[in-house]
Amino acid sequence: MRYINDAMKKNDTPKDGLINRIIELEWDMFDKVTNTGGRAACQDDEWTFYVMRFSQFSALNEAMLQSYEQDLLQAQREGRNMVTEKYGYMMEYTDPAYFDKQLKPVLPQVSPAKEELVDRIANLLLGFEKAFDARYPALYSKSRPLQGAEAGNVSFHLYAIGELKTYSQRTLELYYRQIAGIDPKDEEHNPSFVIHRTTTAFYGYTS
């Protein structure tokens, strides 16, 4: 198993420790993703991977994170790579023909109930991200496009859908329960604001 360098880890609270365990599991899976064009440079960019994933998880509560950790451990026991699956689900939108022929038969099937919950969460996350974009357009201009899949590019919305489809029903329900009542204009609790604040702090900026 490939491990994250301990020197770069934020480890101030029990939640930080939980997030670090999750990132270790994801990093090992990310390292093992195979690409048709060969190994991607980002697979060796440990710092950026750590910052991006830690920032995302900083916006989630411990109950949801604990459930997601169990999803990762279950996948590990079954010999599944949830990061590979995430990219596979995204290809339903970026390369539908390849997805239908090569990936759909081998990816874990997503039930109609799970599909509906994924869509509800992804749309909430899109609303949160739009609120951040409206507040900080110059900063958001450096991020993924919000929607669409032009020229094979994965938007924020499609990336969210791909990742959410790898989560268990239990984890999705905990996720939805956490974010369903948040006002997108509430900068303290809107997860997009939390994520971006955490990211900028890693790079030495303060809001």
Predicted features along the sequence, with ranges:
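Composition-driven low-complexity repeats that form or flank extended alpha-helical/coiled-coil segments
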Residues: 2, 9-10, 205-206
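Terminal low-complexity "docking" segments
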Residues: 5, 9-42, 47, 51, ...
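Intrinsic-disorder-associated interaction segments
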Residues: 11-18, 22, 46, 58, ...
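A cross-kingdom feature marking solvent-exposed beta-strand/loop segments within repeated
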Residues: 36-60, 66-71, 82-84, 148, ...
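Short, structured motif recognition centered on aromatic/hydrophobic residues
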Residues: 57-60, 64-73, 117-121, 164-167, ...
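Repeat-associated, polar segments at repeat-unit boundaries in modular proteins
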Residues: 65, 70-111, 179-206
